[in-house]
């Protein structure tokens, strides 16, 4: 029997189905489990780094860097920016706040000029969201995170896109995976829409945990369960220390 964390790991893996040969940058343990699972199953061409400056030829467990003689390529910081601008990258970040149009906040809570709590700053969010596919992992789906409007825009959402400005043509806020379900921005005016709800989650659960309307909740499918082979990979190969369980509130 699979846990909620393992269902979420599979949902994160599905972010990369049919991605082809692109660089994947998972910024959380859950997203890293998903990326490794995808690479070991249906997306063998995706590229992963060791978190420093090398592309991995193998797919080590979380916290491991693989054999030193199994390096696939060189990816120093400068080349990351080249890849980012080229668009052949999909990043999965966290979000302290996300709104109905996919704006993300990891910078600060409160008014921009007088924030009540400082966080990371915008970091790479602006460059990520304007150049290539960006998804978000949220381990605690609640109204404090899924807000009507973010306090500070770190990563841009669809309501910030100027259709007459070619600089915005690559914006692709792809999906949000939370502990309750999977969501995209296929609703009216690129607003949030339910793609699937995890087993045991009801539309009412999502409504109660979200500060805005999520479209198509009642029509959402059930998130698929991991196969036996996927469960083995998650538990024994990718994440034997069960780090995935620390990121989720079931």
Curated annotation (Swiss-Prot):
Indicate the family of this protein. Answer: Belongs to the 3-oxoacid CoA-transferase subunit B family.
- Primary gene name: ipdB
The record, for InterPro entries, names:
CoA_trans_fam_I (IPR004165), NagB/RpiA_transferase-like (IPR037171)
What does the UniProt function comment say about this protein? Answer: Involved in the final steps of cholesterol and steroid degradation. Opens the last steroid ring of cholesterol by catalyzing the hydrolysis of (3E)-2-(2-carboxylatoethyl)-3-methyl-6-oxocyclohex-1-ene-1-carboxyl-CoA (COCHEA-CoA) to 6-methyl-3,7-dioxodecanedioyl-CoA (MeDODA-CoA).
Asked whether the keyword Transferase is assigned, the reply is no
By what name is this protein known? Answer: Cholesterol ring-cleaving hydrolase IpdB subunit
| Self-association and partners | Heterotetramer composed of 2 IpdA subunits and 2 IpdB subunits.
TM regions (residue ranges) = none
Q: Which domain of life is it from?
A: Bacteria
Loss of function: phenotype = IpdAB double deletion mutant does not grow on cholesterol, but grows as the wild-type on glycerol. In the presence of cholesterol, ipdAB double deletion mutant accumulates COCHEA-CoA. Double mutant does not survive in macrophages and displays severely depleted CoASH levels that correlate with a cholesterol-dependent toxicity.
Q: Using the UniProt record, name the top-level EC class of this enzyme in a single word.
A: lyase
Keywords (alphabetical) are:
Cholesterol metabolism, Lipid metabolism, Lyase, Steroid metabolism, Sterol metabolism
- Give EC number(s), comma-separated: 4.1.99.-
**GO BP annotations listed:** biological process involved in interaction with host; cholesterol catabolic process
Pathway listed for it? Steroid metabolism; cholesterol degradation
The UniProt catalytic activity note for this protein reads: (3E)-2-(2-carboxylatoethyl)-3-methyl-6-oxocyclohex-1-ene-1-carboxyl-CoA + H2O = 6-methyl-3,7-dioxodecanedioyl-CoA
Output the Gene Ontology terms for molecular function. Answer: CoA-transferase activity; lyase activity
């Amino acid at each position: 029997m699979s846990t909620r964390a393992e269902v979420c790991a599979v949902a994160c893996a599905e972010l990369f189905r049919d991605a082809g040969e692109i660089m994947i940058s998972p910024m959380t343990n859950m997203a890293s489990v998903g990326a490794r699972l995808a690479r070991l199953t249906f997306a063998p061409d995706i590229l992963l780094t060791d978190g420093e400056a090398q592309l991995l030829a193998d797919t080590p467990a979380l916290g491991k860097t693989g054999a030193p003689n199994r390096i696939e390529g060189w990816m120093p910081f400068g080349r990351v920016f080249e890849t980012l601008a080229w668009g052949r990258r999909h990043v999965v970040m966290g979000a302290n706040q996300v709104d109905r149009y996919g704006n993300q906040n990891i910078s600060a809570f409160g008014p921009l000029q007088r924030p009540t709590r400082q966080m990371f700053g915008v970091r790479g969010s602006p460059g990520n969201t304007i150049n290539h596919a960006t998804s978000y992992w949220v381990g605690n789906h609640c109204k404090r995170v899924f807000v009507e409007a973010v306090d500070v825009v770190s990563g841009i959402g669809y309501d910030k896109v100027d259709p007459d400005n070619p600089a915005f043509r690559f914006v692709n806020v792809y999906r949000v995976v939370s502990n309750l379900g999977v969501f995209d921005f296929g609703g009216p005016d690129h607003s949030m829409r339910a793609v699937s709800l995890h087993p045991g989650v009801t539309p009412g659960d999502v409504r109660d945990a979200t500060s805005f309307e999520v479209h198509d909740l009642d029509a959402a499918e059930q998130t698929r369960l991991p196969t036996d082979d996927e469960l083995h990979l998650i538990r024994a190969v990718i994440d034997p220390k069960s780090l995935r369980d620390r990121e989720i509130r079931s």
